[in-house]
Amino acid sequence: MEIDKELAPQDRTVTVATVLPAVPGPSPLTIKQPFQSEVLFAGTKDAEASLTIANIDSVSTLTTFYRHASLESLWVTIHPTLQAPTFPTTVGVCWVPANSPVTPAQITKTYGGQIFCIGGAINTLSPLIVKCPLEMMNPRVKDSIQYLDSPKLLISITAQPTAPPASTCIITVSGTLSMHSPLITDTST
């Protein structure tokens, strides 16, 4: 029995994976729309949050009538309030892909995770901005198929043992969406 014998002849051509070519013709018209959402009033108690950007109300409302939507920019802002100087609050934030198993308790163990002390005598009273590294995850928030690696924000809050009467900071998510291919819907009602 010959082991080296080829049972079925194979084409010796080397094939290279290619990217699908762009569809000929003009590219679709896009609409760029800024958005901002208050996602957490923090500081009155310890809290954790995990927010997928595609599911935030302002994003889903803006993308309702479009087939495709991508993030052009994305950031989280931590806004100190009047209570911050008296009641310092620790805020941890981290941007991860939506399918990441990382939890808010693991922010400091994750690349890009940051911890801030909001308020107090010598700590920041200015808004803090943490940009999302969109080049490290999928910026698409709406498409013909569902993606599992769009941006997700992890937040961890550690409040003072003596809780303040109101929030020490407000956390907002802001950015710019690029949308195209309007859905055809009946608007007569």
From Swiss-Prot:
Keyword list (alphabetical) reads: Acetylation, Capsid protein, T=3 icosahedral capsid protein, Virion
Residues bearing N-acetylmethionine?
M1
Keyword Magnesium attached: no
Report the main location listed first in the record: virion
Subcellular location as annotated:
Virion
User: Is the Acetylation keyword given for this protein?
Assistant: yes
- Hey, which family's this protein in? Belongs to the tymoviruses capsid protein family.
- Please explain the role this protein plays, according to its UniProt record: Self-assembles to form a T=3 icosahedral capsid composed of 180 copies of the capsid protein. The capsid encapsulates the single-stranded RNA genome. A pentameric unit may be lost during decapsidation.
Q: What name does UniProt use for this protein? A: Capsid protein
